[in-house]
Amino acid sequence: MPSKVPAAPRDSGKVQHCDVFVLGSGLAGSVSAAILARNGAKVVLADAAAHPRFAVGESMTPQLVEWLHILADRYDVPEIKSLLSVQATTRDIGPHFGTKQHFGFMLHRPDQEPDPREATQLVLPKLLSQAAHLFRQDSDSYMFHVAARYGCTTRQNWRAADLAFDDDGVTVTGQNGEAFRAKFLIDASGFRSLLAEKFQLRETPARFNHHSRSLFTHYVGIKPFDDVSRHPAELRPPVPWHNGTMHHLIDRGWFWIIPFDNYKDSRNPLCSVGLTFDERVYPKPADLTPEEEFNRYLDMFPAVKRQFAGAHRVREWVSTDRLQYSSTHSIGHRWCLMSHAAGFIDPLYSRGLSNTFEVVNALSYRILDALKDDDFAVERFEYVDELERGLLHFNDMLVNSSFISFSHFKLWNAVFRVWGALITPGVMRLTRARLRFQLDNKNPQHFIDLENAPHTGLWWPESDKLKALLEATAETCEKYEVGELDGDEAANIVFRLLQDSDIVNPTFGWKDPRKRFIAPTTMTMIKFMHWATRQGPPEMRELGDENLRGLIRATAKGKKLL
């Protein structure tokens, strides 16, 4: 493991000392820095750019919401809860955030109008919270300033030139000659990681099965899809497409439409727009600008194009090569390659921030304990490497299966349900840990216990059944991809897997292929809890029963959990 290098020369008159140096002040770096500083560490937070600034990762998920709760409660950083919902972001940060009431998916074929029967939607239960479309320049700037208020030394427009590690720590030297001496380094800088470059950590090619590249920017004037779809009212979903994250699915790719103007109190006219597609099927042209290329694909899909009539781009395009990258490892002597600095799959399903904050949770207490014990043995941090690897592995499996299925609606309808079936128990196990923490005098052991699971990185890592369901789905989709199965055969296999699995919740409609719009009501949630506590398999009954009893106890004690 390339983790130690000769000691760097020190100049005690110039080198500034800290406990932790954080490279990158996006949400990953700023939240980590705020947590560490709030809990007594001396932290430097530096970035080559400055706030406010554009960032991708704008769509929230139920699991992300729960991780935000956990980080705020466990590490006593209440400002993190300002990201919990569109109401909270609007109140605490500003009126620039959209609402996310659903994940919406519509299948498109070239030069054809989309069939309204080839659409799926998952509505997020109102019982939880009204998630936000995060306007990242505001959310990231907010958390950066939270970190500063907790005492972090900050540097903007500050580019690291050298990282020199030895047994006792790391010396970080900027291009301006300024030097810092730290006991531990977190690299949260993303793909262009100086740490990954220094230790040659990138795997070539990336180890993942999935392939995609992306074009993205911000627009004003994007029309709601509801206004241009031309679909009859009786075939439309229960929640307007414009009220959530819209995914326009094409063969081996998808357009995203993430509006920031869809919340009643928003004053933000912008809409995030992107196209992510398999670079092997859609090679990057050398003779087109990103805008010309994007418009070429818009011309192929008339209903999507109608959303752009009269709209105007307000940012330069970002045009990537292959998005997927991976690292040999993400933990070494006195350093961590965090989340998007370690690897990336695809923005589909908006897993990025949820995965990031799961890593922040696992890393932060280990650093605080290491500072207290003055013991930074790599072994103390090995779980973080295992976690980052597992999160990427299972996400790769799901996203690759999904891209394969986009060419055949029946198969997509099946894969959509596998994804959906993973969400609720994944959130429930986190809620259970938070309930235990609150009811047991804020004992952090209940969060540490989450790590004792056989399938690290899976949404419900204790579940052999969900792991088997996901693996069988991936195997089936791969057989369809190479022609061993046709689309109907592959879809039928996945639907049988769903039907036969006792761990898949039947009350939402995941087992019914005719129910394309999943919109849990309060009554649906009551029926679900009855199934989870009385009719589900033992592991689900245990999870459901403890959540229900914990919520009742917490409510009786006046603790607000949701």
Residue ranges and their predicted role:
Residues 37-58:
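Glycine-rich FAD pyrophosphate-binding loop
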Residues 53-112:
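N-terminal FAD cofactor-binding segment of flavoenzymes
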Residues 68, 351-371:
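An active-site-proximal "capping" alpha-helix that borders the catalytic cofactor pocket
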Residues 91-190, 194-195:
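Feature captures the FAD/FMN-dependent oxidoreductase FAD-binding
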Residues 146-303, 360:
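Predominantly flavin-linked oxidoreductase catalytic cores and closely associated redox partners
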Residues 317-338, 343-347:
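FAD-binding beta-loop-beta segment adjacent to the flavin cofactor pocket
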Residues 362-415:
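Active-site-proximal substrate-binding core of FAD-dependent oxidoreductases
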